[in-house]
Amino acid sequence: MRATLATLAVLALATAVQSDSRARIVCYFSNWAVYRPGVGRYGIEDIPVEKCTHIIYSFIGVTEGNSEVLIIDPELDVDKNGFRNFTSLRSSHPSVKFMVAVGGWAEGSSKYSHMVAQKSTRMSFIRSVVSFLKKYDFDGLDLDWEYPGAADRGGSFSDKDKFLYLVQELRRAFIRVGKGWELTAAVPLANFRLMEGYHVPELCQELDAIHVMSYDLRGNWAGFADVHSPLYKRPHDQWAYEKLNVNDGLHLWEEKGCPSNKLVVGIPFYGRSFTLSAGNNNYGLGTFINKEAGGGDPAPYTNATGFWAYYEICTEVDKDDSGWTKKWDEQGKCPYAYKGTQWVGYEDPRSVEIKMNWIKQKGYLGAMTWAIDMDDFQGLCGEKNPLIKILHKHMSSYTVPPPHTENTTPTPEWARPPSTPSDPSEGDPIPTTTTAKPASTTKTTVKTTTTTTAKPPQSVIDEENDINVRPEPKPEPQPEPEVEVPPTENEVDGSEICNSDQDYIPDKKHCDKYWRCVNGEAMQFSCQHGTVFNVELNVCDWPSNATRRECQQP
């Protein structure tokens, strides 16, 4: 069994390395687009599947009480077979990945902060996710928590560590299922958000791809009119906005330790609109706005203040005798337009073309769009789907190069997360069958480094009882019993480990080892050679920093 699993791990790694050279075209699909009126209505049948490598159904959520999957629109997604109709597209497009996103701006952050706070609620969520993906035949999960550690959104200081734990535990669960599910995340590029909530090197190692939301970098909240996805810094960018552009934002992810071939660059298929201050005749970038208006006037199909889909912009701005004046941001490489008190900054074929060439120059993994349903899919301004066609033209013929590692700033010791266990091929095999598991002292030893994640067993649960289609709380799922693993040479009470409120428990005999409860099972992890487990900080540290006197000597 050990040899078989080791072989599978090697094959999986070889497959991943091979697939990394293929650029990604990630298309987010907002399921509520079906409710837009008239020509704005967008259904699953309108998705240009052949233009995407990954399509992500948006969104599912998390329940308030038991931290399980929440189906936000059960009538559309379940009763009308939205999920199944979406994943059934695979039959005619077998090379495309059909994933689902959890989160989104409207979901807030407090529920997610609560979910990751305790290992029990994380496990509840993970079991629910596994059941959900199996039931509706998705190819993976995209994490769109906006944002870990964001106090202004109901987050907690501990979210940064706990989000990483969630990602690691999801990865282990997905590997154990053995269906090749992908795990990705949509992330911000503002430095303060990364500092608050993201262990960048570790997340980039665990996730298949990082979808950088390189848009909404300006908006009505800023107090001035501007394009919201500028490629480069402009002369008027000051203070917090000086580095808030696509080029500097992606560089920041690299600088913090993320390989370039894990980064997917976000391209908005929509614009941000503004209402200018009364009597303001200055229509340039950074001009004064009426902030109390909340943004520009709603457009006819998306019907949201301060927000226009690309097809709503092109039908208005590019129309003959429309009265709109169209301009170009020379440094930011984006168009903007104005008429009267209305001002909108957006992306068009010219700006998207520039960004595609820039992605290839930088060696990034590909491009993603929020959202595919806001392209000119009806051909109201000319050909259908002009923006996604540009993404496909460039990315389908582009081979992603190996990552470049220069200019990476080492993570300070105090900011590093606790050590993570190694690949299972280096330690005991993951059980792949289920038999009775005793309730007392199951223990496992895993040889580890501080950079790679182990894949412990994940309980299989009853699909029907583990997914909430409405916010009412459901009974806690009952996991099936797992294989008993022989105890290790270092006897520890497994029930003591798993009943503890602590995520990390130092080994009583060995200074360089510690224990964690993973999916109800006590697992032992080892620090790198020459380091010991720091009980106070829950990290592997130099012996001189050890809080246990007996561990202060190497």
From Swiss-Prot:
The active site is at E146. GO terms for biological process: chitin catabolic process; polysaccharide catabolic process. It is an enzyme of class 3 (hydrolase). CDD domains: GH18_chitolectin_chitotriosidase. InterPro entries: Chitin-bd_dom (IPR002557), Chitin-bd_dom_sf (IPR036508), Chitinase_II/V-like_cat (IPR011583), Chitinase_insertion_sf (IPR029070), Glyco_hydro18_cat (IPR001223), Glyco_hydro_18_chit_AS (IPR001579), Glycoside_hydrolase_SF (IPR017853), Glycosyl_Hydrlase_18 (IPR050314). Pfam families: CBM_14 (PF01607), Glyco_hydro_18 (PF00704). Residues 23-398 form the GH18 domain. Residues 431-457 have a biased composition (Low complexity). GO terms for molecular function: chitin binding; endochitinase activity. Residues 495-553 form the Chitin-binding type-2 domain. Residues 398-494 are annotated as: Disordered. Its EC number is 3.2.1.14. Its main location: secreted. Gene3D superfamilies: 3.10.50.10, Chitin binding domain, Glycosidases. The keyword rRNA-binding does not apply. Epidermis and gut. It is found in: Secreted. It comes from the Eukaryota. It catalyses: Random endo-hydrolysis of N-acetyl-beta-D-glucosaminide (1->4)-beta-linkages in chitin and chitodextrins. Digests chitin in the exoskeleton during the molting process. Belongs to the glycosyl hydrolase 18 family. Chitinase class II subfamily. This is Endochitinase. It comes from Manduca sexta (Tobacco hawkmoth).
